[in-house]
Amino acid sequence: MARLFVAVALFGVVAFAAAEKEWTGKTWLGSWASTDRAENWEAFVDALGLPSDQYPREVQRTIHTIYKQGDKYHHEVSIPSKNFKKAIEYTLGTETDVQHGPHTIKLKYTEDGEKLVADVQIPSKNKQIHDIYEVQGDTLTKTYKVGDVVAKRWFTREANPTA
Protein backbone atom coordinates (compact mmCIF):
# COMPACT_ATOMS: atom_id res chain seq x y z
CA MET A 1 0.00 0.00 0.00
CA ALA A 2 2.84 2.38 0.86
CA ARG A 3 4.36 1.75 -2.60
CA LEU A 4 1.09 2.73 -4.20
CA PHE A 5 1.05 6.04 -2.32
CA VAL A 6 4.67 6.71 -3.28
CA ALA A 7 3.92 5.91 -6.94
CA VAL A 8 0.83 8.14 -6.95
CA ALA A 9 2.73 10.93 -5.20
CA LEU A 10 5.65 10.71 -7.64
CA PHE A 11 3.40 10.50 -10.68
CA GLY A 12 1.40 13.48 -9.48
CA VAL A 13 4.56 15.55 -8.96
CA VAL A 14 5.97 14.55 -12.35
CA ALA A 15 2.68 15.28 -14.13
CA PHE A 16 2.35 18.62 -12.35
CA ALA A 17 5.94 19.61 -13.12
CA ALA A 18 5.50 18.72 -16.80
CA ALA A 19 2.40 20.88 -17.00
CA GLU A 20 4.09 24.10 -15.84
CA LYS A 21 4.61 26.81 -18.43
CA GLU A 22 8.18 27.89 -19.13
CA TRP A 23 8.82 31.56 -19.89
CA THR A 24 12.63 31.64 -20.06
CA GLY A 25 15.34 30.26 -22.32
CA LYS A 26 14.27 31.97 -25.56
CA THR A 27 14.07 35.73 -26.05
CA TRP A 28 10.70 35.47 -27.78
CA LEU A 29 8.97 33.55 -24.96
CA GLY A 30 6.52 35.76 -23.11
CA SER A 31 3.37 37.78 -23.44
CA TRP A 32 3.52 40.60 -25.98
CA ALA A 33 0.94 43.38 -26.47
CA SER A 34 0.85 45.33 -29.71
CA THR A 35 1.63 49.01 -29.83
CA ASP A 36 -0.05 51.45 -32.22
CA ARG A 37 3.03 51.31 -34.42
CA ALA A 38 2.68 49.48 -37.73
CA GLU A 39 4.37 49.75 -41.09
CA ASN A 40 2.77 48.87 -44.44
CA TRP A 41 -0.08 46.98 -42.74
CA GLU A 42 -2.83 47.82 -45.25
CA ALA A 43 -0.69 46.66 -48.19
CA PHE A 44 -0.01 43.38 -46.36
CA VAL A 45 -3.72 42.77 -45.74
CA ASP A 46 -4.50 43.59 -49.38
CA ALA A 47 -1.79 41.17 -50.56
CA LEU A 48 -3.36 38.39 -48.49
CA GLY A 49 -6.67 38.81 -50.29
CA LEU A 50 -8.57 37.56 -47.24
CA PRO A 51 -11.88 39.02 -46.06
CA SER A 52 -11.42 42.07 -43.83
CA ASP A 53 -13.27 40.34 -40.96
CA GLN A 54 -10.37 37.84 -40.78
CA TYR A 55 -7.61 40.41 -41.25
CA PRO A 56 -8.85 43.94 -40.55
CA ARG A 57 -7.20 46.69 -42.59
CA GLU A 58 -6.92 48.85 -39.48
CA VAL A 59 -4.42 47.78 -36.85
CA GLN A 60 -6.16 45.93 -33.99
CA ARG A 61 -4.73 45.54 -30.48
CA THR A 62 -3.24 42.06 -30.55
CA ILE A 63 -1.63 39.95 -27.84
CA HIS A 64 0.82 37.14 -28.58
CA THR A 65 1.57 34.77 -25.71
CA ILE A 66 4.34 32.28 -26.43
CA TYR A 67 5.50 29.70 -23.90
CA LYS A 68 6.90 26.20 -23.61
CA GLN A 69 5.09 23.44 -21.75
CA GLY A 70 6.84 20.08 -21.60
CA ASP A 71 8.23 19.29 -25.06
CA LYS A 72 5.76 21.55 -26.89
CA TYR A 73 5.63 25.26 -27.55
CA HIS A 74 2.36 27.17 -27.45
CA HIS A 75 1.44 30.35 -29.30
CA GLU A 76 -1.79 32.04 -28.30
CA VAL A 77 -2.99 34.97 -30.38
CA SER A 78 -5.84 37.13 -29.15
CA ILE A 79 -7.57 40.21 -30.50
CA PRO A 80 -9.71 41.43 -27.58
CA SER A 81 -11.90 43.81 -29.63
CA LYS A 82 -12.91 40.95 -31.93
CA ASN A 83 -13.30 38.45 -29.07
CA PHE A 84 -10.84 36.31 -31.03
CA LYS A 85 -8.41 33.81 -29.55
CA LYS A 86 -6.42 31.11 -31.34
CA ALA A 87 -4.18 28.61 -29.53
CA ILE A 88 -1.49 26.80 -31.50
CA GLU A 89 0.61 23.93 -30.14
CA TYR A 90 3.80 23.13 -32.03
CA THR A 91 7.23 21.56 -32.04
CA LEU A 92 10.06 23.60 -33.56
CA GLY A 93 10.88 22.32 -37.05
CA THR A 94 7.68 20.28 -37.45
CA GLU A 95 4.76 21.31 -39.65
CA THR A 96 1.41 21.49 -37.89
CA ASP A 97 -2.13 22.01 -39.24
CA VAL A 98 -4.40 24.64 -37.72
CA GLN A 99 -8.03 25.30 -38.59
CA HIS A 100 -8.84 29.00 -39.08
CA GLY A 101 -12.44 29.47 -40.13
CA PRO A 102 -12.95 27.50 -43.35
CA HIS A 103 -9.20 27.35 -44.01
CA THR A 104 -6.69 24.71 -42.96
CA ILE A 105 -3.42 26.51 -42.40
CA LYS A 106 -0.06 24.77 -42.34
CA LEU A 107 2.45 26.25 -39.90
CA LYS A 108 6.08 25.50 -39.34
CA TYR A 109 7.97 27.32 -36.60
CA THR A 110 11.78 27.33 -36.62
CA GLU A 111 14.55 29.40 -35.08
CA ASP A 112 17.09 31.58 -36.85
CA GLY A 113 19.58 32.50 -34.16
CA GLU A 114 17.58 34.42 -31.53
CA LYS A 115 14.59 34.89 -33.87
CA LEU A 116 11.42 32.81 -34.05
CA VAL A 117 10.36 32.19 -37.66
CA ALA A 118 6.90 31.03 -38.73
CA ASP A 119 6.20 29.86 -42.25
CA VAL A 120 2.46 29.88 -42.89
CA GLN A 121 0.78 28.25 -45.86
CA ILE A 122 -2.86 28.81 -46.76
CA PRO A 123 -3.35 26.18 -49.49
CA SER A 124 -6.97 27.13 -50.23
CA LYS A 125 -5.84 30.68 -51.06
CA ASN A 126 -2.46 29.67 -52.55
CA LYS A 127 -0.78 32.11 -50.13
CA GLN A 128 2.40 31.83 -48.11
CA ILE A 129 3.33 34.13 -45.24
CA HIS A 130 6.78 34.34 -43.72
CA ASP A 131 6.77 35.81 -40.18
CA ILE A 132 9.84 36.73 -38.15
CA TYR A 133 9.65 37.51 -34.42
CA GLU A 134 12.70 39.46 -33.28
CA VAL A 135 13.28 40.77 -29.76
CA GLN A 136 15.39 43.72 -28.66
CA GLY A 137 15.06 44.44 -24.95
CA ASP A 138 11.35 44.52 -24.11
CA THR A 139 10.26 45.12 -27.71
CA LEU A 140 9.25 42.42 -30.17
CA THR A 141 9.17 43.32 -33.85
CA LYS A 142 7.08 41.03 -36.01
CA THR A 143 7.89 41.19 -39.71
CA TYR A 144 5.27 39.77 -42.07
CA LYS A 145 6.03 38.94 -45.71
CA VAL A 146 3.59 37.76 -48.35
CA GLY A 147 4.92 37.80 -51.91
CA ASP A 148 6.97 40.99 -52.27
CA VAL A 149 4.99 42.87 -49.61
CA VAL A 150 6.63 43.35 -46.21
CA ALA A 151 4.86 44.77 -43.16
CA LYS A 152 5.89 45.21 -39.53
CA ARG A 153 4.19 45.53 -36.18
CA TRP A 154 5.71 46.29 -32.79
CA PHE A 155 4.86 44.71 -29.45
CA THR A 156 5.95 45.36 -25.87
CA ARG A 157 6.59 42.71 -23.26
CA GLU A 158 3.91 42.30 -20.62
CA ALA A 159 4.67 40.72 -17.27
CA ASN A 160 4.82 36.97 -17.78
CA PRO A 161 2.20 34.99 -15.93
CA THR A 162 3.53 32.66 -13.26
CA ALA A 163 1.61 29.63 -14.52
Swiss-Prot record:
Recorded GO CC terms: extracellular region
Ranges for region SAHS-c2: 67-95
Compartmental location: Secreted
Free-text function comment from the UniProt entry: Secreted heat soluble protein acting as a molecular shield in water-deficient condition. Tardigrade-specific intrinsically disordered proteins (TDPs) are essential for desiccation tolerance by forming non-crystalline amorphous solids upon desiccation, and this vitrified state mirrors their protective capabilities.
Keywords in alphabetical order: Secreted, Signal, Stress response
Region annotation (SAHS-c3) ranges: 108-157
Signal sequence extent: 1-19
Chain residue ranges for the region called SAHS-c1: 22-51
Misc. comment: Trehalose, a disaccharide essential for several organisms to survive drying, is detected at low levels or not at all in some tardigrade species, indicating that tardigrades possess potentially novel mechanisms for surviving desiccation involving tardigrade-specific intrinsically disordered proteins (TDPs).
Protein name as annotated: Secretory-abundant heat soluble protein 53582
Induction: Expression is highly induced during desiccation.
Domain comment (free text): SAHS-c1, SAHS-c2 and SAHS-c3 are 3 highly conserved regions within the SAHS protein family.
Disruption phenotype: Affects slightly survival under dry conditions but does not affect survival under frozen conditions.
Recorded superkingdom: Eukaryota
Family stated for the protein in its record: Belongs to the Secretory-abundant heat soluble protein (SAHS) family.
